[in-house]
Swiss-Prot record:
Gene Ontology CC annotations of this record: cytosol
Location of this chain's protein in the cell: Cytoplasm
Record-given protein name: Phosphoglycerate kinase
Binding partners and assembly: Monomer.
Reactions listed under catalytic activity: (2R)-3-phosphoglycerate + ATP = (2R)-3-phospho-glyceroyl phosphate + ADP
Keywords: ATP-binding, Cytoplasm, Glycolysis, Kinase, Nucleotide-binding, Transferase
Residues bound to substrate: D22, F23, N24, R37, H60, F61, G62, R63, R118, R151
This protein's pathway: Carbohydrate degradation; glycolysis; pyruvate from D-glyceraldehyde 3-phosphate: step 2/5
Species of provenance: Wolbachia sp. subsp. Brugia malayi (strain TRS)
Family: Belongs to the phosphoglycerate kinase family.
Disulfide bonds: none
GO BP terms in the entry: gluconeogenesis; glycolytic process
Gene coding for it: pgk
Amino acid sequence: MMNIPNIENCDLHGKAVLLRVDFNIPIKNGKVHDATRVLRSLPTIRHLVNAGAKVIIISHFGRPRAKDNNLSLKNVVKTLSQLLNKEVKFVDDCIGKKVQKVVNAIAIRDVILLENLRFYKEEEQNDANFAKQLASLADVYVNDAFSCSHRAHASISRITEFLPSYAGFCLQDELRYLEKAVSFEAKPITAIVGGAKISTKIKMLIRLAEKVDYLVLGGAIANNFLLFNKVNIGKSFFQNGVDSLLHDVVKIADKNNCKIVIPEDVLIAVNSDYSTCILRKTESVLDNDVILDIGPQTLSTISSIVASSKALLWNGPIGVFEHSAFANGTIEVMKVVSDSTHKGKLTSVIGGGDSLSAINAAGLTDKDFTYVSTGGGAFLSWLSGDKMPGIAALQSMLN
C-alpha cells in the first residue's frame, strides 16, 4: 500500500488532535438524511478517544459564501453524539480566541466539533495564515477525509506544514481498496463507468483501459461512444468535441486487450417525455429518441461479464436511475455485483457522486459490496492518476 504515516503507533495521550473529516452530508430541515460519512469517521474518533487524546474535529459543509446557519455543522452534532455514544460539544467558530479557550479547557478523551471551515474564504484559498491558526489549536493533525484530499485547501494540505501529520483509518481504507482493485492479480478485472460528462473522465478511462479486461460504459458516456461508432443517438445527451479523446481510449484499450462494452439495446423516451419508455436496438434509435437506460440484452451481457470477474470498479450510473422507468439497468447490475461479492467471487469497489443514491435505489447498503468509497471527485482524481494534495502532503511527512 501507498506509504503514508498513520496513527496506529502514535503516542497521543494528553495531546490535542485536530481531526479533519468530511461531514459534508445530506441534511434536510436540520436532520441528517445519510450518515455514511459520519459512520466512516467513528473508528478514527474512537481510536483517538481510547488513546487519551483531546479530539478537535474540523470539516466543511456545503459551499457557503458567508456564515449561514443553514450550513452550520451544529446540525451534525446530535447525530455524531448518538453514533459515538458520547457527548460532543459544538463550538460556533473554527479559529480565534473563543475556540482556543474551549480547546484549553477540554480534558483527555473529550470530543468537540468546530464550525464550518468554509465560513472562512481562506480555507479554499489554501491560505497559510488560516492553516497556521487551525494548527495552533493542536499538537497533531490527522487527515481522515479522503473525499476532500484531491483539493489543495488549508485544512487538507497547507496545515501539514505546521503540525506532525497522519492518516486516519477511513483514509487508509480508501487507498487500500482502490489500490487493490486496480492491481488485482486474478483476472478478469472489470470497470463500469457511467455518468454525463466524458471530458471529466477521459484520464480515468485511459488509465483503466491500461489495467482492466472489460471497460463497460453507460450513461451519456456510452452515448458518446455510440456516436463515435456512427450510431444514431437521436436527441440523447452527449458531449461535443471529444472524438480525438475517444480515439485515444480505443487505441489504448486495443493495445492492452481491454474490451470496451457499449449498449446493444436501450430504453428510450421520445422527446424527453419520461412517461414513454420504449425498447430499441441501438442501430434502430430514431431522431427524436432520448437514450435513458440499457436494454435487457445489454443487461445480460454486463451481468455475464460481472459474474466472470474477480475484481470490479464502478464509477457513475448506467442510466437515469432517478426515474423509475429508467432505473432498471443500474439497479439490476448493482444486484449482480452484490450477489457475486456475497458469494466471495468478486472484490467490488464502488465510488462517485451518485453511488450511494444508486445503492439505496437498489435496496442495498454499503455492506453489500467489498468497499464503497466516500469520495466523489477524489475517487475520480485517484483513478485518473492525478496528484492529490492531501495525500502528497502526508507522504511528505516521511521525507
